[in-house]
Amino acid sequence: MDFYSLIFLSCALGMDAFAVSLCKSFSVKKLHLKHYLIVGIYFGGFQALMPTIGYFIGITFASFIASIDHWIAFILLSLIGLKMIKESLENENCNSNAKQFGFKTMLALAIATSIDALAVGVSFAFLNVNLLLAIFLIGIITFILCIIALKIGNKFGIYLKNKAELLGGLVLIILGVKILIEHLFFD
């Protein structure tokens, strides 16, 4: 997977965290540095950790599924993308009354938003991916997206949440199709 594909993948994976960060910003009248760090570190950290775990799960089973690896990557990325698109169309409201930045809440949200990254990590085991670069980009880009989301969310509100998830879903599906086409026609 080339550098630009990793950038697009990182942005797509960060869209769930971006959407949740928008919601987080609605619960605070004034954001402080600690809010940015809490949200960025939790989401960026878990988005980087989960593909690593997924990668090692994938290589454990690599010999069993090497001949269908491109189909696995395509199916996983497409299913994740479709899930994100479906969620973007459901119009869920953000909860602005809960304790939004506590350990349990942030841990649960970080894990929930990074499950997609775990599945992508499994597909990394079957692709030509620089794992360290991918993990770095996914973590940093998610961190940056969360910071941007907190800023934007304070200004523009819930309207943007669904658009971010929709875009992220479309990007994942496009990457899945690209991987499938490369392996079917150019290997």
UniProtKB/Swiss-Prot annotation:
InterPro entries: Mntp/YtaF, Put_MntP. The chain crosses the membrane at residues 3-23, 35-55, 56-76, 107-127, 129-149, 166-186. Keywords: Cell inner membrane, Cell membrane, Ion transport, Manganese, Membrane, Transmembrane, Transmembrane helix, Transport. It is found in: Cell inner membrane. One of its GO terms (molecular function) is manganese ion transmembrane transporter activity. It is a multi-pass membrane protein. One of its GO terms (cellular component) is plasma membrane. Belongs to the MntP (TC 9.B.29) family. Probably functions as a manganese efflux pump. This is Putative manganese efflux pump MntP. It comes from Campylobacter jejuni subsp. doylei (strain ATCC BAA-1458 / RM4099 / 269.97).
